[in-house]
């Protein structure tokens, strides 16, 4: 068969499954199954790139954060690398579609991960946290050990909530040499204040599930 067509159709299918999760909370019984299908199809499609997209895991506090790495080219020559971080409702697979192609076309390695609160991690009890620089540091720890990453040209790009997480991480980690943000949520308080749950009474909050309490 035609590998490019196969790759494109697998990635298209992955994104269709991903779109079905847009308005679904992680405590929905279908969330885990569909999320796993997103990952399965994406990895099958990613394997058909040249070089193939690599799935990797970042050790973090006794568990791991899932991510993807697309090399700029074959071989282990160190080159500039872009790490992308998403926001409140993103999957690492989303972020690949967002800018990986553009990064690759400009000679960058591209990496992205799910931080606590993102992707399927809420199903493991890993919800958002205020010290997001801690998991980002763990990601950088993994990246700088790769022979194909130029440690003097590691940059990070964040969208939405990631537009807050990225500069925060750079404040704590000088290994991040440059940052860029898009539609950054730099103050979450006004955003959360517009959400119905923020207006719940103590009696209503007593009926929250453990998932909602964590979020």
Give the positions of each predicted feature:
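The serine-hydrolase catalytic nucleophile loop
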Residues: 88-101
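Conserved alpha/beta-hydrolase
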Residues: 103-120
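N-terminal targeting or regulatory segments adjacent to alpha/beta-hydrolase or S9 domains
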Residues: 1-50
């Amino acid at each position: 068969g035609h590998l490019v067509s196969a790759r494109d159709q697998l990635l298209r299918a992955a994104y269709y499954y991903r779109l079905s999760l847009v308005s679904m909370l992680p405590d929905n019984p279908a969330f885990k199954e569909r999320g796993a299908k997103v990952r399965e199809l994406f990895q099958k499609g990613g394997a058909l790139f040249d070089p193939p997209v690599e799935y990797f895991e970042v050790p973090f506090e006794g568990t791991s954060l899932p991510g993807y790495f697309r090399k700029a080219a074959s071989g282990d020559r160190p080159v500039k690398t872009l790490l992308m971080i998403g926001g409140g409702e993103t999957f690492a697979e989303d972020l690949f579609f967002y800018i990986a192609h553009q990064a690759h076309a400009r000679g960058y390695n591209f990496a992205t991960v799910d931080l606590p609160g993102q992707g399927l991690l809420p199903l493991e009890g890993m919800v958002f946290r205020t010290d997001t620089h801690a998991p980002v540091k763990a990601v950088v720890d993994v990246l700088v050990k790769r022979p194909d990453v130029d440690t003097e040209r590691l940059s990070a790009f964040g969208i939405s909530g990631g537009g807050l997480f990225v500069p925060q991480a750079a404040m704590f980690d000088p290994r991040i040499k440059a940052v860029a943000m898009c539609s950054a949520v730099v103050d979450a308080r006004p955003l959360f204040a517009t959400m119905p749950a923020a207006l719940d009474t103590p009696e209503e909050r007593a009926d929250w599930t453990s998932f909602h309490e964590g979020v």
